[in-house]
Design a protein with these regions (language model features):
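A structured, mid-to-C-terminal "fold-capping" secondary-structure block
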Residues: 156, 160-167
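Regulatory sensory and allosteric helical modules in signal-transduction proteins
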Residues: 104-143, 148, 162
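Short, positively charged
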Residues: 1-11
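Regulatory loop-to-helix N-cap segments in sensory/regulatory domains
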Residues: 165-181, 191-195
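A short, aliphatic-rich beta-strand micro-motif
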Residues: 147-155
């Protein structure tokens, strides 16, 4: 089949020759498009495999934690190293003692600063893209250069994780959020387990 697609058919006069040349050209174009799509699927599969390996590593790391502060620190470290996140922000509704990092905040669920996140927290679905400016100070303070695109992961009744990037195209509306949801669920389960 590849040989047939690379053949050059001499042009002849007449309707039959013109039609066969036209059909051959259409088949070549379709073949190019299918090869392009196959290559794209292969790249997506490789990216997904890499993400699954990192989520597996995060799962194992969280299983090894014993205290709430270990859970929070482990999550942030894995997001920064394994997932190559430029900026991570973890907000919990209940205090986690022992975490004295600028990327961590304890903000009670009824605090007015969380009002801009009401819809996100209620839906419990990750959001990707650019955020409205009123949400940025709570998440990133003065470090807004990391807020060109953001993945926002609500954690049920536990809190909120924000991952920021300088790249305006890293997180975008419509991108898949399954892996982000898994990260949130792992964090929530590990934090609950460590508090028992």
């Amino acid at each position: 089949p590849d040989l047939a697609l690379s053949l050059v058919v001499p042009k002849e006069d007449g309707r039959t020759a013109a039609l066969s040349s036209y059909q051959l050209e259409i088949l070549r174009d379709k073949n190019k498009e299918l090869n392009r799509r196959l290559h794209e699927l292969s790249l997506n599969a490789q990216d997904n495999e890499r993400l699954i390996r990192h989520i597996h590593a995060l799962s194992l790391a969280l299983l090894r934690t014993r205290r709430p502060d270990d859970v929070v620190n482990t999550l942030a470290a894995c997001l920064k190293t394994d997932f190559e996140s430029e900026s991570v922000r973890v907000i919990t509704f209940a205090a986690v003692y022992g975490v004295e990092e600028p990327w961590y905040s304890h903000i009670p669920a009824d605090d007015a600063r969380l009002k801009p996140f009401t819809d996100c927290l209620a839906s419990n679905e990750p959001i990707c893209g650019r955020l409205n400016p009123e949400k940025l100070p709570v998440l990133f303070g003065e470090a807004r250069e990391f807020a060109q695109s953001i993945a926002l992961i609500p954690i049920g009744g536990t809190g909120l994780i924000a991952v920021g990037s300088r790249d305006p195209h890293r997180f975008y509306p419509g991108m898949g959020t399954l892996f982000l949801r898994w990260i949130g669920e792992l964090f929530e389960a590990a934090l609950a387990q460590s508090r028992r």
